[in-house]
Amino acid sequence: MPDRKELLDRARAMRREQTPAERRLWGLLRGGQLGGLKFRRQVPLGDYIADFVCFYPRVIVECDGGQHAESAYDAARDAWFRAEGFQVLRYWNADVLEHPHETAEAILRAVGRGP
């Protein structure tokens, strides 16, 4: 279980070293561009760090690479996020990179703000 300072330092490092998919999605989410939703990136929550968080509505968006295909860690993490009242949306890195606008539309639909 990481201490708070360690978690904050790790989140800062992750913001500096985003994956290409995270960078692409952040370009669509930042500054309320997506339906006025206010997202933050690499946010410590409990013992975890969420890729993107919008506190209203309570939604977490995760960009996943191949290492997430069958991760028990991700399942436990998602369960914790859900227990805290968050909706968890996961998208494959390849989908974010190849279809960024469709991914953004899917996020809007999931939170009830899309067509």
Where are the language model's segments positioned?
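Basic, amphipathic alpha-helical patches used to engage nucleic acids or provide basic targeting signals
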Residues: 13-19, 46-111
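Residue-level detector of family-conserved "landmark" positions at structurally sensitive sites
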Residues: 39-42, 91
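Solvent-exposed, charged helical/coil patches
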Residues: 1-38, 112-115
